[in-house]
Amino acid sequence: MPTISVDQALIDRLVSKHGYQHDTEYLAENLPLLGTDIDKCDAETLDIEIFPNRPDLLSGETLSRAIRNFIHNAPATPNLDIKQGKLELIVDSELKEIRPVVLGAVVRGVNSGASKMESDAFIKSLMDHQEKLHFALGRGRKRASIGVHDLTKIKPPFSVKAVTNDTHFTPLSMDNEMSIKQILLEHPKGIDYAHLLDGFDKYPVIVDAESRILSFPPIINGDHTTVTADTTEFFIDVTGWDYRSCEACLMLIAMQLEEYGGTIESVKLTTCDGSIKHLPNGDAIEHKLPKKLLNGLIGERLEESQISRAINRMGGKLISKDDEDITLLMPRWRFDILHPVDLLEDIAIGHGLSLIHI
């Protein structure tokens, strides 16, 4: 299971700004009830193993959001607030055979911290989160890979094109231009992930209005879009082969930035098949849970108020309840919810497994 290490100061910052008091001892006692294993919880650090079915907990920022609901009973917000933006991302039809899923989002007004220590911790957390998502959802960047850019250093609209391997740009943390062929053969990230582009004679790049390469997914970003502690406006790209994985990665990175005061904006996307969409979609997903299934597997009848409190602790909302079904709203980024049994598990955890008599 992936392990994350989070500064208690970050959790305190993101919990207290919503009016809740962070208590490390109480956290250590109760957070495992969410379905996690704590390796270490002291005054400075929380080291925690995240179960594979909860990739939405893989950063200190998204974990803090869950802590507010689960530990402090904060009202859940399963809908993600996304303003309609004007930025355009246009995908060439050639990408259909190379890397067909391309998504994007903008986040503005991010404040990474009041001190260098806070800002440095923010950059480290953002980088760590990307790599954790590449492993957990991206399956080593095959299903999904993420690029995060300083939006002020590039000029929209952006295009995603297929180019030959003699195309040059300066990759992240390098001083000189390299060709795509050189990157795949010589750059550490190229060596690690070149196999994902085996068999292609053209390669995906994202370029801005001035033809500068932002990204060569799933390998490396361009150096000129590097995010720093001073970055306040971000462009996120996610590309891959699996739409659900890409969508979850996009939303989770955007949510991480939102925790620092950022406002998420949608991108007008022209896909490789020519359709036009405004993404990401922050609307929660409505689920039906048969009452017979809930009562049968939990072994007792929960009152409506108990169900409402339980699902709120897990980030969802009870919408209605009739003779047959319970209707729930769950966040779109809860990638793990595929079946009514997954909803049942959330209710059981939110209610308290120790309170259920089977």
Language-model region placement:
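Short beta-strand-to-loop capping motifs
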Residues: 50-52, 107-112, 236-240, 330-332
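Short, conserved charged micro-motifs
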Residues: 22, 56-59, 113-123, 243-248, ...
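Short amphipathic C-terminal alpha-helix that caps PH/PH-like domains
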Residues: 67, 127, 249-257, 347
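Mobile "lid/hinge" segments at catalytic clefts and subdomain interfaces of large enzymes
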Residues: 87-104, 115, 119, 136, ...
